Amino acid sequence: MASLYQRFTGKINTSRSFPAPPEASRLLGGQGPEEDGAGPKPLGAQAPAAAPRERGGGGGAGGRPRFQYQARSDCDDEDELVGSNPPQRNWKGIAIALLVILVICSLIVTSVILLTPAEDNSLSQKKKVTVEDLFSEDFKIHDPEAKWISDKEFIYREQKGSVILRNVETNTSTVLIEGKKIESLRAIRYEISPDREYALFSYNVEPIYQHSYTGYYVLSKIPHGDPQSLDPPEVSNAKLQYAGWGPKGQQLIFIFENNIYYCAHVGKQAIRVVSTGKEGVIYNGLSDWLYEEEILKTHIAHWWSPDGTRLAYATINDSRVPVMELPTYTGSVYPTAKPYHYPKAGCENPSISLHVIGLNGPTHDLEMTPPDDPRMREYYITMVKWATSTKVAVNWLSRAQNVSILTLCDATTGVCTKKHEDESEAWLHRQNEEPVFSKDGRKFFFVRAIPQGGQGKFYHITVSSSQPNSSNDNIQSITSGDWDVTKILSYDEKRSQIYFLSTEDLPRRRQLYSASTVGSFNRQCLSCDLVDNCTYFSASFSPGADFFLLKCEGPGVPTVSVHNTTDKKKMFDLETNEHVQKAISDRQMPKVEYRKIETDDYNLPIQILKPATFTDTAHYPLLLVVDGTPGSQSVAEKFAVTWETVMVSSHGAVVVKCDGRGSGFQGTRLLHEVRRRLGSLEEKDQMEAVRVMLKEPYIDKTRVAVFGKDYGGYLSTYLLPAKGDGQAPVFSCGSALSPITDFKLYASAFSERYLGLHGLDNRAYEMAKVAHRVSALEGQQFLVIHATADEKIHFQHTAELITQLIKGKANYSLQIYPDESHYFSSAALQQHLHRSILGFFVECFRIQDKLPAVTAREDEEED
């Protein structure tokens, strides 16, 4: 049981409180303490892989396995070959026997050489992945953040920091901003004006929530102009909530104190066009906490018309939303608190309205009319997208999130016309995705769920076309099948092609496809076999769809290349991340395997990470990593180097992930299974994955652990008390980072989406609590980690959990991060967090490794 010192000092997982992390070989009972001076040895170098363990598992110094291959003495050979009469030796027989032995030995040696994988020798020379690697420049993926600005040109940032304009057709480059200038301004973000005359920089940026921030902004003429501060007329040196260019010339807006300011061009005084804002209460053009985190998934809540003459913006009113306070314990004699509006399940939600203002001439503010539908008494606005310069598409979603109405609103009158309606018995998924419009706005493509047989609905492209002199639209499905379209990228009118990403290849992959929008809707994969060691792509097309930027995201090292749409031919590489490729080629990277398991008529994918030196004859600890947020995906062919990589590479663990019921991209039947049953079905599926792994001879059944963060922290807490077939605990230990422990304490939009409206029927909320689960803990080590100023999942969740753990006399440890937010923005804190988690599991696996020896000593003493 963790000591009181460990529980409350915050040092339970530091390098002083845990012994130095052992090598993978030590975790597996290989190198003994007496060999420490020899330095770490790779796992595969300790004993021949084919050598069987001697039964009883005991023997040799340091607890190392003994092997049955032993040399026989000369006397043994004499007795066997000659008999008991010494003078009568058969020298010829001895010579023949020795010759046979030599031949057999040579055959064995030859076989070992031929059958040993060629990589084994090189593996022993490679380094193991460490926590330091995660934060080193060698492993930092560079994303050029390329953005198309014309049919043939895009802007990107090179590794040295300079901002480059690249012409695809002429293959020429122009430096717009030197990297040194960005460094001198201490700028964190930059943006180029549409006419390429000015650059906008932000510096001294201070994060607010996941996406939002405040910062100082300056404007500078390209390439070498002096910076000039961007401020509202009434304030100098103001810290702004947002600033950004419009679609034309040098027009820009910025937001200060939740009010919107407009500037027609650089040098002209900004005018306040929206002035109803109230700090922390009424947001104009920006999201409040709930919309930023759960609905729009961005802090930006304003949208320019294509011609720059109008601006649509949301007004979000939090005045009736209950206030949460985030305490600050350090830096003052008395703790202080930061209040903000946070709606929990069943509480008052923010109200929202959508407005359009004209930017040419006198400001005219017009509110778009919401649907007149009794199911929409409370609603969210989940998507806004301009179709033309006077028409704007808006998606309205009921608070219960089971009814949505897509409308097309007239920006000159405020009248909204219904274009599509969707309804679900569970919840509506993927509600903030934007449709793609034709130039005249009469045709648009959007993704909707379509029935595809026994697996329920899958998300496919539908085209809606307005008919002349008719109020009814013609709707057709472009794609179909038991796979999902994950994103519509572009519509090429001149070629009648739609471009999109999908899971048609496999759910864990993302390939780029095109489909004809006429005739039989013929479909073609553009990215299949296009890039070596890459099956997970994203892409962006030039405005005319003649070229596209193709971003490989895995399983190999991410790259970015430019292609011609006509023949898919690669024109050039924009980024290859060779430094990362070199770094991982020098490391013992995990081996990745994929399997499927069967449970309750479902085939569920699992991902297994094994040490590079993996052998079937060794015994490895098993770590189950859970996420499982409904609609998410854990098993994907994406490149990542994380603390899990360190756990596998440096500490010889096997890591497994499973996409069970509630996960995305496998049909709505599997997705919606967890409705009003959070926790129970996920437990069943994750435990089935563990049971499958425990059948493998290379898994040590005494060293099994579970980890999760956020919703995954909820699941890891839910799973930890699980029992095996013999009613013994399956897990030796577990850890939860920022766990949700009671959904009535969490965000309204999230909890109500999956458990229903709180207050109408609370049984689903009560059943989902982890309190009734943790009372069944039987001595398993449990590490709970939480930041005290977590704005997303309040420390209140962990406080409630600890209360239950104390009542149940559980063996828990608590690690807090004082005054830190949910996202751990500091690299130093992230590094400490990773070390803490790794140290906990290394110690857990080491203790379990010693238990059999301790038991044996106790038995000897009793005898």
Curated annotation (Swiss-Prot):
Keywords: Cell membrane, Disulfide bond, Glycoprotein, Membrane, Signal-anchor, Transmembrane, Transmembrane helix. One of its GO terms (molecular function) is serine-type peptidase activity. Disulfide bonds join C409-C416, C525-C528, C534-C552, C733-C844. Glycans are attached at N171, N402, N469, N533, N564, N811. The keyword Metal-binding does not apply. N-glycosylated. Residues 1-93 are cytoplasmic. It holds the Pfam family DPPIV_N. One of its GO terms (biological process) is protein localization to plasma membrane. Predominantly expressed in the brain. Isoform DPPX-L is expressed exclusively in the brain whereas isoform DPPX-S is found in brain, kidney, ovary and testis. Residues 1-86 are annotated as: Disordered. It is found in: Cell membrane. Residues 39-51 have a biased composition (Low complexity). Its main location: membrane. The chain crosses the membrane at residues 94-114. Residues 115-863 are extracellular. It is a single-pass type II membrane protein. Belongs to the peptidase S9B family. Homodimer (in vitro). Interacts with KCND2. Identified in a complex with KCND2 and KCNIP2. Forms an octameric complex composed of four DPP6 subunits bound to the KCND2 tetramer. Interacts with KCND3; this interaction modulates the channel gating kinetics namely channel activation and inactivation kinetics and rate of recovery from inactivation. Regulatory subunit of Kv4/D (Shal)-type voltage-gated rapidly inactivating A-type potassium channels. Modulates the activity and gating characteristics of the potassium channel KCND2 amd KCND3. Promotes cell surface expression of the potassium channel KCND2. Has no dipeptidyl aminopeptidase activity. This is A-type potassium channel modulatory protein DPP6. It comes from Bos taurus (Bovine).
